[in-house]
Amino acid sequence: MLNPKVAYMVWMTCLGLMLPSQAQSNDYRPSYHFTPDQYWMNEPNGLIKIGSTWHLFFQHNPTANVWGNICWGHATSTDLMHWAHKPTAIADENGVEAFTGTAYYDPNNTSGLGDSANPPYLAWFTGYTTSSQTQDQRLAFSVDNGATWTKFQGNPIISTSQEAPHDITGGLESRDPKVFFHRQSGNWIMVLAHGGQDKLSFWTSADTINWTWQSDLKSTSINGLSSDITGWEVPDMFELPVEGTEETTWVVMMTPAEGSPAGGNGVLAITGSFDGKSFTADPVDASTMWLDNGRDFDGALSWVNVPASDGRRIIAAVMNSYGSNPPTTTWKGMLSFPRTLSLKKVGTQQHFVQQPITELDTISTSLQTLANQTITPGQTLLSSIRGTALDVRVAFYPDAGSVLSLAVRKGASEQTVINYTQSDATLSVDRTESGDISYDPAAGGVHTAKLEEDGTGLVSIRVLVDTCSVEVFGGQGEAVISDLIFPSDSSDGLALEVTGGNAVLQSVDVRSVSLE
């Protein structure tokens, strides 16, 4: 859960800035990214698949377009793209709001909250008491396949007094429980974030209700982690195969409030070992640990209970790092497009790699393709294409010293430019002229990521464009940049150009995306 004090300050300072600076026919609402039906959303919660249904819970204010009255919103899908809005899953009540958490299936009914014929699904969340601003950990359960959720009568399951020996903030900074069953030890594991102390704590339970502290993972115990990376939040933890080997490794994913490549919050992942009580981190590489180099990928979590026959680790995050500031009036916050996360060796380094889920192909139609064509300085390709919901894929061999530029959401005076600069192997997103950037000091600028040519000299770039966002995937997905943009409706053009040398286009595929 993002820091409530910061969110409250943003709310209070921005109430007078809610009107957009330019008229928009759809209030910038995306075409194929999830947004709440109305009002405020931040990070996803409790991502779980139950049967054939994907469940998305999320931090939500159901009464206003600002942070506050936080509960778990709920939506379901059978394909991770078409979402049905559902009633509030876990409400704020009696002065206690429902902050971030996770869900898991209890097939053996170890919690005793279901029965052997109908085991429960469980959701752990942070209870935020508004009067004291303190946080404790709570439990809810479902015995109807996630349709409705009941709060456990014995809440909290970890009180502020139980947290006290491990929390120097007096209950102000202990939140976002990640819970899973650890097969090797036969225990349930809870990972808590302590943003004010830059640490995670690990707890165990035999029954999902009674918890015992086991260890802390502190920033000082992670070799190579910068001291500038502070305010740890929203942990996730899972085993991930190392592609091309028979090995798996434990991964901890979290969202620091400060220290990301684009400034402010961002999502990082580290590998290590876990013995059922403590996590030992591998030395980190600052060049590979960040999952996204853009400004708008925050509070990522992964879906659990995904069948082995599927085998994917699918993650999503909220795209909004500006509080109430973005120029939308009926909604705030959108979900990143779901992406797979894997771990593989790229060149000489081990990388986390991400790609949009393949289901996207089922809702996209090719508009134009090119193959084996050389583009030279002064040429502009793709300029006949118009669209605000696109999937653009470009694979090319750049000349030494060349810069390949793909402009999206291009208009008379607006464009968002994705560049690949061959001389320093840099992928970038330039929002300087992307549209409305007046709403926040961090809304413009250029975000960069390192992207090396492959062994043959090929560079691959994939760009998901929607009404108010770009998500750029470079190479095999080892370089990712996600950013919000707010152009005018009329800025719907596309342009592919090169400067400083030629580029041989191995393939180009521009696809229109539509949920209809």
Curated annotation (Swiss-Prot):
Q: Does the keyword Ribonucleoprotein apply?
A: no
Which positions in this protein are listed as binding substrate? Answer: 40-43, 59, 67, 99-100, 175-176, 233
Compartments in which it is found: Secreted
Q: What is the effect of changing residue 18 to T?
A: In strain: AF10
Q: Name one Pfam family in it.
A: Glyco_hydro_32C
The residues forming the signal peptide are 1-25
Carbohydrate-modified residues are 109, 210, 372, 419
**Catalytic reaction(s) noted:** Endohydrolysis of (2->1)-beta-D-fructosidic linkages in inulin
Resulting phenotype, residue 419 to K: In strain: AF10
Task: Describe its applied uses.
Answer: Plays an important role in biofuel production. Pure nonhydrolyzed inulin can be directly converted to ethanol in a simultaneous saccharification and fermentation process when combining A.niger and S.cerevisiae. Endoinulinase can digest fructooligosaccharides with high degree of polymerization (DP) values (>20) into short molecules that may be readily hydrolyzed by S.cerevisiae SUC2. Thus, introduction of an endoinulinase gene into S.cerevisiae will improve its inulin utilization and ethanol fermentation through collaboration between the heterologous endoinulinase and the invertase SUC2.
Asked if Cytoplasm is a keyword of the record, the answer is: no
Q: What is its EC number?
A: 3.2.1.7
Keyword annotations from UniProtKB, A to Z: Carbohydrate metabolism, Glycoprotein, Glycosidase, Hydrolase, Polysaccharide degradation, Secreted, Signal
Q: Which named protein is this?
A: Extracellular endo-inulinase inuA
Organism name: Aspergillus niger
Protein encoded by which gene: inuA
